[in-house]
Amino acid sequence: NSIIQQNFDGYEIILIDDGSRDNSNNICKQYAATYPHIIFIEKENEGVAITRNKALNIAHGEYIFFIDSDDIVYPESFGKVVSILTNTQPDFLRYDFNTIDIHDANLYPNHLRKKRKKYHCMVLNAADFMQKVIKNEYYLCMHVFRRDIIDKNNIRFLDGCTYNEDTLFIIQYLQHCSKCIYADILFYGYRKCDEAVTAHFTEKHYNDVKRVYRALSKLATDNNKIQMGKNIQRVAGELALHLHKHVSAKQHIDKEYQDIENDCKQKALSIEWNFKRWLPENLCNIAWELINLIKKIANRL
């Protein structure tokens, strides 16, 4: 409803039922029967990557937005974003969001938004955009993509991956961008719920992050732009930190993770991995906790 009620109508909506077990199928059919610009596809459950790839294969629009089914688009925001797209013709655009509950109420402030404001409608290259605007927020639904760049470079989601697959997709895409723009527009309401696929870190998620780490490391090695390669390595290092937080609960640390940890320490991908390289384990853990606290405080300043 939040999309249909926008003050803009030059778009298509692709709804895909990935084997839902509730009444979603009937609701989607009703929407498709009522609105000619809605395309509805029903299929067996194959996971988020294959589902999104199917949508990309049939999309017709010049620009691609990804909207999760339980989230919302704020009133009149669609037209504002499209106006910027039309006037600036960027390769990549980022808008902003609030994290909301089931009643659409804000859960907590978006502290990084005020840091991004100074880049509103400023043209940046991909490497600068990663550092100054995205930071560590590689959220698929907060960005707009050009379909021709996606198709020309055959960019697709990693099959079977359900955790950090958006990070990999965005970085693959950014390698082909020269004109990135941030729009200081509150466009998206991201609904935080306990039932979400990413709400609890599972063994499947653990293995997915390792897959994404390997893919990012290869992208960084293959990239011939020095700063872009460093940025990609930094993101890979952040993913490895996420792995490390959960690996202590495992009874057996697998060789693949150990190889990732050694890679991060050898490349000194962040200050945390530098500490891990030189400090004893107990001092390293204290240092990591202090760094994490400092980062949280810095984000709120």
Task: Go through each PLM region and give its residues.
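A conserved acidic beta->alpha catalytic loop
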Residues: 17-26, 44
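Acidic helix N-cap motif at the loop->helix transition within catalytic regions
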Residues: 22-30, 72, 76
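Glycine-rich, basic loop-to-helix element that forms the pyrophosphate-binding segment
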Residues: 43-59, 80
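Catalytic core of nucleotide-sugar-dependent glycosyltransferases
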Residues: 185-194, 199-227, 238, 242-268
